[in-house]
């Protein structure tokens, strides 16, 4: 049944690249076969509950601009928000959604009331999922908005906050399992510091490692079959976050013996904040074997902060999905639109239009990436560039069969005096442009 929030808008359909209908897909065709697989199954789109239905449209210099009928902290409002959300998922044809606990339930006066409220809304979501066929890509706990978390959650100097945070994550993992979630995400928005003057770095990292081990242990205890994901971000809201980027997360996982247990959820905007490209972080995750899922958005390159805009750059998407596909594609993960409207975008249609544009952009990027892989457009030049490493002597060096002094003797014996080979960057950039 329609809530009326979106008026008489019908389900969004694919109309092809010549369509000028703003409420239609021009490139995203769920059933189109790309690289032997349905486009919908490649991309696994999800809608972010927080930015789409909870964000009030504020910024550091101004408050709420959006007027939503569910903007009250009551269970009745939470259920109305759920009604609108699942109507939105159905109109858009999004197969998945994601949420924080605080996005979906009213705030209680204590932990027990929060848990009661979450359990009630989980039951409501379960029925909505059954009615619509929409699934949960991942759940997570908001351990950063409430003032109790201002000095961190797992890394807080107060063990009571650590305990409260651990208990909250337990209930959110239970909720995620109940709803059949494919993943559980940890984002350490307050797990970092503002100044080292009041920070015991070693202690906080040990606390964070213990916390993550507790999460993994509980995953096995309850039989949760999804993937545990960490979402890297270098800063904002803290000056420095401990999960700075993919490489930092991998070092942290190795230190705590969790590199086989936890993967990463990579957000494009966070990669940019860390001084990386999106494809850099995806390639690093593949290299370390910890790629899990992506949060799709973009930052304004001039602003210098996390603007969470919908993607609109096809070449960027092509290179991103190239690395997703090169790593074997999504398994439990997907493409979550961690994107929000601009605060002047007041019309309910804007929610649909933003997602439609983002989905079309991703679809174009996916098709370009799949074609590049099919043609070997980048992989063939790459194989040629490293071909000499396949020689017997090179393989001996790589396998550790030659000691340093033996390598030195080999260079002297064979009078090895290498000349540089061309990198062909301009050629490869032109190749990519042919596909997009």
Curated annotation (Swiss-Prot):
Gene Ontology annotations of biological process type: D-xylose metabolic process
PROSITE patterns according to UniProt: XYLOSE_ISOMERASE
Active site: 100, 103
Entries under InterPro entries matching the protein: Xyl_isomerase-like_sf, Xyl_isomerase-like_TIM-brl, Xylose_isom_bac, Xylose_isomerase
Key words of the record: Carbohydrate metabolism, Cytoplasm, Isomerase, Magnesium, Metal-binding, Xylose metabolism
Cofactor binding notes: Binds 2 magnesium ions per subunit.
UniProt cross-references to SUPFAM superfamilies, sorted A to Z: Xylose isomerase-like
Recorded GO CC terms: cytoplasm
Record carries keyword Membrane: no
MF GO annotations: magnesium ion binding; xylose isomerase activity
Binding site for Mg(2+) 1: 231, 267, 295, 338
Binding residue positions for Mg(2+) 2: 267, 270, 306, 308
EC number: 5.3.1.5
Reaction catalyzed: alpha-D-xylose = alpha-D-xylulofuranose
PANTHER family from the UniProt entry: PTHR48408, XYLOSE ISOMERASE
Family matches, as HAMAP family: Xylose_isom_A (MF_00455)
Subunit structure: Homotetramer.
Official protein name in the record: Xylose isomerase
Highest classification ranks of the organism: Bacteria, Pseudomonadati, Pseudomonadota, Alphaproteobacteria, Hyphomicrobiales
């Amino acid at each position: 049944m329609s809530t009326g929030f979106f008026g008489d808008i019908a389900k969004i359909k694919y109309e092809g690249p010549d369509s000028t209908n703003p409420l239609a897909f021009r490139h995203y065709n769920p059933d189109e076969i790309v690289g032997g697989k349905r486009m919908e199954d490649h991309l696994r789109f999800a809608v972010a509950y927080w930015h789409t239905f909870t964000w009030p449209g504020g910024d550091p210099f101004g408050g709420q601009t959006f007027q939503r009928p569910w903007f009250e902290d009551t269970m009745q409002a939470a259920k109305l928000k759920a009604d609108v959300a699942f109507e939105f998922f159905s109109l858009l044809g999004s197969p998945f959604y994601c949420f924080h606990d605080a996005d979906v339930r009213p705030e209680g006066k204590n932990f027990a009331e929060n848990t009661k409220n979450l359990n009630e809304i989980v039951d409501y979501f379960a029925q909505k999922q059954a009615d619509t066929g929409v699934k949960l890509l991942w759940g997570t706990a908001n351990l950063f908005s409430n003032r109790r978390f201002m000095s961190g959650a797992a890394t807080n100097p107060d063990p009571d906050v650590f305990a409260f945070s651990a208990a909250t994550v337990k209930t959110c993992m239970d909720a995620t399992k109940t709803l059949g979630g494919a993943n559980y995400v940890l984002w350490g928005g307050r797990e970092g510091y503002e100044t080292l003057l009041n920070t015991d770095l070693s202690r906080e990292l040990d606390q964070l490692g213990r916390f993550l081990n507790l999460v993994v242990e509980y995953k096995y205890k309850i039989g949760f079959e999804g993937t545990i994901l960490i979402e890297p971000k270098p800063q904002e809201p803290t000056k420095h976050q401990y999960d700075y980027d993919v490489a930092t997360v991998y070092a942290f996982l190795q230190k705590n013996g969790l590199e086989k247990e936890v993967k990463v959820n990579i957000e494009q905007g966070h990669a940019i904040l860390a001084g990386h490209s999106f494809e850099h972080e995806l390639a690093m995750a593949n290299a370390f074997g910890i790629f899990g899922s992506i949060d799709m958005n973009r930052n304004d390159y001039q602003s210098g902060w996390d603007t969470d805009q919908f993607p609109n750059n096809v070449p960027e998407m092509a290179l991103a999905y190239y690395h997703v596909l090169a790593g074997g594609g999504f398994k439990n993960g997907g493409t979550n639109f961690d994107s929000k409207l601009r605060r002047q975008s007041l019309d309910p249609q804007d929610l649909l239009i933003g997602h439609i544009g983002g989905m079309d952009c991703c679809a174009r990027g996916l098709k370009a990436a799949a074609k590049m892989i099919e043609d070997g457009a980048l992989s063939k030049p790459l194989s040629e560039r490293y071909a000499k490493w396949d020689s017997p002597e090179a393989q001996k060096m790589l396998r550790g069969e030659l000691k340093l002094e033996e390598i030195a003797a080999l260079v002297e014996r064979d009078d090895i005096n290498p000349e540089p080979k061309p990198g062909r960057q301009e050629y490869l950039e032109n190749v990519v442009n042919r596909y997009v």
